[in-house]
Regions:
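Rossmann-like dinucleotide-binding domain for NAD(H)/NADP(H)
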Residues: 123, 130-230
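Glycine-rich Rossmann-fold phosphate-binding loop(s) that bind the pyrophosphate
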Residues: 47-48
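Residues at the starts of beta-strands that form the adenosine-phosphate
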Residues: 41, 63-64
Length: 230
């Protein structure tokens, strides 16, 4: 949400512009992506726990919300009052913002590629706070360079820390004119607050205690490697 708002409401854009000329650039209409949120279509890829949380927040802004998740059962979208589409191309083709909320695996690595990005509605803003390798960084570079999408906000990258030699990162770091204000990067920090760190430690302890007590293993993502899951 923060990346979306920063781009759509011109927060970082106006801050940088006003630093250059606080008087002459005091012009709200300069923001390149300004659009009333309630007039936007917000798309989510992945309707799990985090995707659902994003949906509820987008709806609170009055946005029309659409989802794509081939693994969710029929009617999952109805339980949160949103619409469903049957392909990524369909989602990207009708949304103003697309936010990614899916795990990384063999079927999702480089899922967001040039074929998908080229189907984007004009002016689309892409947000990735899931996992970096889900988006093909070379294809993202091409999509931004060729104006297939308007802007992108990422909290994750295929290589972390960022590879300063990648063409996209190099152009962003150099403030090249074609990408200026169109790419926001944060250091995998979307989750981070003192409260989040406390929750991770507390919940990790809870899971360990429950497992050691013989009451099962919660949230296991590699059960095939657990010799005694109890």
């Amino acid at each position: 949400m923060a990346l979306m708002l920063s781009l759509m409401k011109g927060v970082t854009f106006h801050t940088r512009e006003l630093k250059q000329d606080p008087k002459g650039l005091w012009r709200p209409a300069l923001s390149p992506f300004g659009k009333r949120l309630s007039a936007c279509v917000f798309g989510v890829v992945g309707l799990g726990r985090i995707g659902t949380a994003a949906v509820l927040r987008a709806k609170a802004f009055g946005m029309d919300v659409v989802m794509f998740d081939p693994y969710r059962e029929n009617g999952a979208e109805l339980s949160v009052g949103i619409r469903r589409v049957n392909s990524l191309e369909e989602l990207f083709g009708q949304c103003d913002i697309v936010s990614l909320h899916l795990p990384l695996g063999e079927t999702t690595e480089k899922l967001i590629n040039l074929e998908v990005l080229s189907a984007s509605k004009p002016g689309l803003v892409l947000i990735n706070t899931a996992r970096g390798p889900i988006v093909d960084l070379d294809d993202l570079y091409t999509a931004l360079k060729e104006n297939m999408i308007a802007a992108c906000g990422v909290d994750v990258l295929p290589e972390e820390p960022a590879n300063p030699e990648h063409p996209l990162i190099k152009a962003w770091a150099a403030d090249e004119e074609w990408i200026d204000h169109r790419l926001l990067i944060t250091p995998h920090s979307a989750f981070f607050t003192p409260e989040s760190v406390y929750d991770m430690r507390f919940k990790g302890g809870e899971v360990a205690i429950k497992y050691l007590d013989g009451r099962g293993l919660d949230n296991c993502v590699n059960r095939q490697w657990v010799e005694n899951p109890r």
